[in-house]
């Protein structure tokens, strides 16, 4: 409903994605000042996103705590899932360490740490329980729009050749509940292709140079920690 209200994702989905990633990366990899500024900007944007959902008739509010926590939790669970599929398995202690560190960014976007699950496993179970709740997940016009955008790929020309593969992997790494919702019929050969490609990433990654192993904001943050303490995210980012 919030996406329908802004509708920016329809006018320029790629620009919307880049802007969202830029703000998120600034919170994660920027200086303390930059993280605070980006979080404040996110919070300001969220202040005006509220109303009545046309599909369910329920009230939505981008500053509602449960809705904020849902987005945060899905991002965290997805991040750890992808890391374990393409890098290595994490111990429960490592996952909890990430969870505790991630709570800092959650607080910046107005999520109450005292109302959050206190371990990664608890957070993951919270997400799973909600997805299995009847009528919690619905396919709406907005969800179908996003599905179409991912399938057709209105992306820069240099990315277009690999976009069908990215789209395929995006849909076929979704949890079963989400695949069913989007009508993604995963056959055995689909699963094989996914597993083979994830295995290739996991095997080859250690041998790749940092340019390919790390996203740019992570490399810039590493530079700042090692020898450039004054380096700011906005100085390097062209987003």
Predicted regions and their residues:
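Mature, function-bearing regions of proteins
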Residues: 1-239
């Amino acid at each position: 409903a919030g996406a329908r209200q802004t509708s920016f994702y329809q006018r320029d989905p790629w620009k919307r994605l880049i802007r969202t990633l830029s703000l998120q990366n600034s919170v994660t990899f920027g200086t303390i000042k930059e993280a605070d500024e980006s979080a404040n900007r996110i919070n300001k944007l969220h202040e005006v996103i509220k109303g009545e959902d046309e599909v369910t008739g329920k009230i939505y509010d981008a500053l509602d705590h449960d809705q904020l926590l849902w987005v945060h939790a899905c991002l965290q669970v997805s991040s750890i899932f992808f890391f374990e599929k393409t890098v290595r398995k994490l111990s429960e202690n490592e996952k909890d360490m990430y969870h505790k560190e991630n709570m800092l960014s959650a607080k910046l976007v107005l999520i109450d740490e005292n109302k959050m699950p206190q371990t990664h496993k608890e957070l993951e179970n919270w997400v799973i329980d909600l997805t299995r709740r009847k009528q919690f997940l619905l396919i709406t016009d907005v969800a179908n729009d996003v599905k179409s955008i991912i399938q057709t790929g209105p992306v820069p020309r240099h990315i277009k050749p690999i976009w069908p593969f990215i789209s395929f992997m995006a849909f076929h790494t979704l949890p079963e509940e989400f695949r069913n919702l989007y009508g993604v019929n995963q056959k055995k050969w689909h699963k094989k292709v996914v597993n083979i490609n994830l295995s290739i990433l996991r095997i080859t990654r250690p041998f790749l140079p940092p340019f390919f192993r790390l996203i740019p904001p992570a490399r810039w943050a590493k530079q700042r920690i090692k020898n450039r303490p004054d380096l700011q995210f906005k100085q390097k980012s062209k987003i």
